Amino acid sequence: MSRVAKAPVVVPAGVDVKINGQVITIKGKNGELTRTLNDAVEVKHADNALTFGPRDGYADGWAQAGTARALLNSMVIGVTEGFTKKLQLVGVGYRAAVKGNVVNLSLGFSHPVDHQLPAGITAECPTQAEIVLKGADKQVIGQVAADLRAYRRPEPYKGKGVRYADEVVRTKEAKKK
């Protein structure tokens, strides 16, 4: 039995929750997020809280309820506070710039890399070697950060590449003669 699903998600003031069958819509100051939940999950909205439980006839009901609780908690946090993800560019000549909703990267290729940001995600560059992504949808922010990192992953000898700000890159020792 999932212990995660037993804790309710507190809905703060200023957040509007609509439940239409298995489709949940959460609206706040940072935008509106919608998610379709698994059929095994039953969601109730009462007393400024969302409670979760399994439906009868589903073997994985508690597990799905725990997953649904975690996803909706992230949605509530996203529409109230938002999420940020920081990336660092390590390497000589590696630079980033933001123009509108396009991130321009110089990563040592013979051409510049232009990455189009999806709707709801904003980027800024405090320095040329740093990118800060902001948005309400945690999953989309993580995917955009992973896409940017995939252009030039940190290599294991010098650690050059695009890395998350909190990422520790393990470096190998060079080959000895």
From Swiss-Prot:
GO terms under biological process: cytoplasmic translation
CC terms in the record's Gene Ontology section: cytosolic large ribosomal subunit
Pfam families documented for this protein: Ribosomal_L6 (PF00347)
Taxonomy, superkingdom: Bacteria
Keywords of this entry: Ribonucleoprotein, Ribosomal protein, RNA-binding, rRNA-binding
Cystines in this chain: none
Keyword Ribonucleoprotein found: yes
GO molecular function, a single term: rRNA binding
Cross-referenced PANTHER family: 60S/50S RIBOSOMAL PROTEIN L6/L9, LARGE RIBOSOMAL SUBUNIT PROTEIN UL6M
Reported function: This protein binds to the 23S rRNA, and is important in its secondary structure. It is located near the subunit interface in the base of the L7/L12 stalk, and near the tRNA binding site of the peptidyltransferase center.
Similarity comment text for this entry: Belongs to the universal ribosomal protein uL6 family.
Record note on quaternary structure: Part of the 50S ribosomal subunit.
Protein name: Large ribosomal subunit protein uL6
Record lineage: Bacteria, Pseudomonadati, Pseudomonadota, Gammaproteobacteria, Enterobacterales
